[in-house]
Amino acid sequence: MPVEYLVDASALYALAAHYDKWIKHREKLAILHLTIYEAGNALWKEARLGRVDWAAASRHLKKVLSSFKVLEDPPLDEVLRVAVERGLTFYDASYAYVAESSGLVLVTQDRELLAKTKGAIDVETLLVRLAAQ
């Protein structure tokens, strides 16, 4: 089954809490290498603030991340072009570029990225779509 959705770090964080609702559709979901580091940084921050046990959270994150196909990194010049044209960060532009150039639906919780990426959806919409399949 082909990949249909590109999940950014904000969506990954939200999806981690709903593992049972999407895991059977994992072959439709992909991330970027960047997503791994962004998710790790969010985990680091939560651990530093004492909100999570880093070891347990790390095990869960590893399980979640291993469920996704990791896509190739996009051409940096194209990502920079999208970032400048749309007023996005380089990180966000990488998701927008890959989703649009690959015909994937971007899944994000970032309002600006939702507004500036053609066809982007949030996690709630993704879960509804997957449940209907």
Curated annotation (Swiss-Prot):
A GO MF annotation of the entry reads: RNA nuclease activity
According to the UniProt record, what class of enzyme is this? Answer: hydrolase
- InterPro entries of this UniProt entry? PIN-like_dom_sf, PIN_dom, PIN_Pae0151-like, TypeII_TA_RNase_PINc/VapC, VapC_family
Q: Which UniProt keywords apply?
A: Exonuclease, Hydrolase, Magnesium, Metal-binding, Nuclease, Toxin-antitoxin system
Q: List the cofactors.
A: Mg(2+)
Question: What SUPFAM superfamilies does the entry give?
Answer: PIN domain-like
Q: What is its EC number?
A: 3.1.-.-
Could you tell me which residue ranges the PINc domain spans? 5-113
The UniProt function text for this chain reads: Toxic component of a type II toxin-antitoxin (TA) system.
**Family of the protein in this entry:** Belongs to the PINc/VapC protein family.
Give the multimer and partner information: Homodimer, 2 of which then form a homotetramer.
* Protein name in UniProt: Exonuclease VapC9
Gene behind this protein: vapC9
